[in-house]
């Protein structure tokens, strides 16, 4: 659990499966490809390994499991074509819109660290600009050139890059730079949780119930003094965690 008297100054978010229900679409389109090769649907245990990883890394997981005759890039390209028709129907996850609005209204710095590449990010959010415009320039996508190849989640780089953007914005406003320990990172995937913890941030893990159940005895390795879990973003209490009365420090 979080320390009782700690107050955080910024909130950083993953996107897929946390802010938008894209994981349902990912699973559906993956199963369409697997079915074409006569393979079984994607099991939750493999799905858990894919979540939070950049596209090519996630593709490698499913290819290694299924032995389908595709390269990771071929798999990514095929999924891109199939998924394109679904993105316009993508819906926010419960509590996501209200939380982002609440943070924005209180002047809390927010940022987005998504493994989605820029093209996918734009397609997923085109009809949700009223939510994602709140992040301003504090967005790093999985194909951002500042993230070295092979350094996506579970490495900490993407969170630290987003924090750099937040601090650049704070400097322009005459505010002090924040350290990772002053930030909360919201994640739904295990690789993402590991990534944010490695960055030195406090983590709020909002997992799919099936993923959480799959973890079993390893739960204590994930949920510790640096990480806690919530069933939904709607359960997050900003007054408990955030320094909303002295945000200009």
UniProtKB/Swiss-Prot annotation:
Coiled coil: none annotated. InterPro entries: Gpp1/Gpp2-like, HAD-like_sf, HAD-SF_hydro_IA, HAD_sf, PGP-like_dom2. Pfam families: Hydrolase (PF00702). GO terms for biological process: pyrimidine nucleoside salvage; rRNA catabolic process. GO terms for cellular component: cytosol; mitochondrion; nucleus. GO terms for molecular function: phosphatase activity; pseudouridine 5'-phosphatase activity. Belongs to the HAD-like hydrolase superfamily. CbbY/CbbZ/Gph/YieH family. This is Uncharacterized protein C4C5.01. It comes from Schizosaccharomyces pombe (strain 972 / ATCC 24843) (Fission yeast).
